[in-house]
């Protein structure tokens, strides 16, 4: 077994101060995601880990791309027959993590996932490249397959089927909006004295009210 205990580095890019924080965490999130995108350090700056829990209480994570965010929450799209969708149907409490370590930052979100309307899903689906639209029809996400060749054969079949005209939206393809109940911003600090600030909803409905802001020990 490898010993990784000697792998470490100092965090030197700067701190996060209470007086700099906006009242609305989405304002800070927008600033941070623009900075990581503009830095061009990460090839997928919108990549986030989505954690869900199954009926037995077993958590599971996967990387998903954030497609939209606003004061109502964070939006992503997926196959509605996938493991994540099945787990959300059982328990819609989820967490998101944006690991922007290149800027010595991370953002952790907790909240509830709400399924998007067909209108919202279609509005995004039509913007996808045609090959990606076809791929949505091909993959029964999270199911077992015999070999990659089976997937490629199905893709070729569906590509021929949809060679003319628009690709329709599959009924089993959709999206979710995660309405946040808390958002934590983490900025690396020297000597492991990191800065952590937690925004928590004042209103239990998750849809109204302001935010409490607390500094957390690193």
Swiss-Prot record:
* Keyword tags: Flavoprotein, FMN, Oxidoreductase, Pyridoxine biosynthesis
Q: Name one GO molecular function term.
A: pyridoxamine phosphate oxidase activity
- Which pathway does this polypeptide act in? Cofactor metabolism; pyridoxal 5'-phosphate salvage; pyridoxal 5'-phosphate from pyridoxamine 5'-phosphate: step 1/1; Cofactor metabolism; pyridoxal 5'-phosphate salvage; pyridoxal 5'-phosphate from pyridoxine 5'-phosphate: step 1/1
Say if the entry is tagged with keyword Thylakoid.
Answer: no
Binding residues for substrate: 8-11, 67, 124, 128, 132, 192-194
UniProt: FMN binding residues: 62-67, 77-78, 83-84, 106, 141-142, 186, 196
Among the Pfam families in the record, one is PNPOx_N
Gene3D superfamilies per the UniProt record, alphabetical: Electron Transport, Fmn-binding Protein, Chain A
BP terms from Gene Ontology: pyridoxine biosynthetic process
Q: What is this protein called in UniProt? A: Pyridoxine/pyridoxamine 5'-phosphate oxidase
Q: Which organism is it from?
A: Shewanella loihica (strain ATCC BAA-1088 / PV-4)
């Amino acid at each position: 077994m490898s010993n990784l205990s000697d792998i470490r580095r100092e965090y030197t890019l700067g701190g996060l101060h209470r007086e700099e924080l906006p009242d609305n965490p989405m304002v800070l999130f927008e600033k941070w995601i623009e900075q990581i995108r503009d830095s061009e350090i990460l090839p997928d700056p919108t990549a986030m880990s989505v954690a869900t829990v199954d009926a037995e209480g077993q958590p599971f994570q996967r990387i998903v791309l954030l497609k939209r965010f606003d004061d109502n929450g964070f939006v992503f799209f997926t196959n509605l027959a996938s493991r994540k969708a099945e787990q959300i149907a059982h328990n819609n409490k989820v967490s998101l993590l944006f690991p922007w370590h290149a800027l010595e930052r991370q953002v952790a979100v907790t909240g509830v996932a709400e399924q998007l309307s067909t209108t919202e899903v279609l509005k995004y689906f039509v913007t996808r490249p045609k090959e990606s639209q076809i791929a949505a029809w091909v993959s029964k996400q999270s199911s077992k397959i015999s070999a990659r060749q089976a997937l490629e054969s199905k893709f070729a079949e569906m590509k021929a089927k949809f060679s003319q005209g628009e690709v329709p939206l599959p009924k089993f393809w959709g999206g979710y909006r995660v309405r946040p109940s808390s958002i934590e911003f983490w900025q690396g600090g020297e000597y492991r004295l990191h800065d952590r600030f937690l925004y928590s909803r004042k209103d239990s409905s998750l849809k109204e009210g302001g935010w409490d802001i607390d500094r957390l020990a690193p």
